[in-house]
């Protein structure tokens, strides 16, 4: 099947920080240092397929670092975050004309961050609309829409510090934190967090009692992790996490569940610096927090030869995309022998399959 690239001019007046497809791949949101968000729709025509502008508007008072879509069951909903320390929730108003700058209405602002909001991620959970935010103040905050059909009411449910050593670092917009939820069904929620200037990434697990516990560390990085992505498992017996790093490498980690004795699990948690306790002060074990994973670095690629800024899995977790300062989007997949390889390298004008 032939493949093609569709190039279009976004019309942004400054650097584009992020682009994001909706669940079906028919819509695209772009955000920029020009403080504007633009929503695009893919229109298929007999002569040519094009991306048409749905609307564009000034969304923040500083550079917008990320814009993402909520799952489609909650309607047409976008969240955006910025250097202005705010996260905003936007909802499409189909009664408003396209390109009227009124098509997308602001429903709520999350303003608890004391520094730039560097990353955001909607939780994969069903029956509740949750959003995690990651700020330069070193705190991950988790919010929930009190009524998913009414996006004007959100509440902060939980928060945790990224540093497991309780180090209070100065608020630095260049701290480089990033987050992603585990998209797979587990006993309790999990997420993976890029540790910024502490170098590396760590899994955090919910203990079932409103606490997030620092857990397994993803080793091997020599500089900051710019982006992180947890793969859908699609019935695999193991899980995969990919990282994009300032040290020019794309890494893929394999997580295999271990069944350790309870005492050994508690010892590991004590070594990490925090053990969840009940109100009586006794250690508790619940859900995913009681499970341990063996972490294995199974692939490391330096093909970008430059800083890597983004990694993302496809919906089945079988293809990984990465992009970096070399101006290329690279696609990675595994062969029958279980080894990961580059399957394509995409530039603005051409697609050149890699040599096998």
Task: Please place each PLM-identified region on the residue numbering.
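Blade-level signature of beta-propeller repeat domains, shared across WD40, Kelch, NHL, RCC1
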Residues: 312-355
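Beta-strand-rich domains and repeat architectures in extracellular enzymes and scaffolds
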Residues: 8-35
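WD40-repeat beta-propellers
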Residues: 37-42, 87-92, 120, 140-145, ...
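Inter-blade linker and blade-boundary elements of WD-repeat/beta-propeller domains
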Residues: 1-11, 46-61, 94-119, 147-182, ...
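Loop/turn-rich, solvent-exposed surfaces of beta-rich toroidal or solenoidal domains
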Residues: 225-264
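WD40/WD-repeat beta-propeller blade-loop signature
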Residues: 15, 24, 53, 63, ...
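Loop/turn segments within WD40 beta-propeller blades
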Residues: 19-26, 68-75, 121-128, 178-188, ...
